[in-house]
Amino acid sequence: MPKLAIEVLNDYPLATEAIRDWFLKKMIESFEQDNAPEDFKKQMLSRGVSDITLAIMLDQSPRNFFDVFDENKIVIEVLRDTDINPDLFYYKINGKTPGTFFEQRIPCERAAVEKAFELLN
């Protein structure tokens, strides 16, 4: 059974902090190009990127983390098993696969991201 998203964040604090910093940096970059009111920008920056936000992203759309890991030389690929069963998915990280198969793409992505947290930590 996979860990809860909040457990992943707690188990890999160094990775969590690096990821939080990455998303905050991206938020700041987007504000520099955005015409949003200054008070809105300040409010969003003061909130930062919470563990709850990261946990929701991990559960609902784990591929949002792929760019973070790419920049840290942890490259995730999610593939279909075209040789044995094309209805199954598996992942590779830096060309290596754990040999685990998934019936749906999102659980496969989540497992890959969890492994990437471990590697980044």
Task: Enumerate the predicted regions with their spans.
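Long, terminal "pre-/pro-" and other extracytoplasmic accessory regions
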Residues: 1-7, 116, 121
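Non-catalytic interaction/assembly regions
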Residues: 5-10, 23
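Generic detector of isolated residues embedded in canonical secondary-structure elements
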Residues: 13-14, 107
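Ampiphathic alpha-helical segments that act as solvent-exposed interaction surfaces
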Residues: 101-121
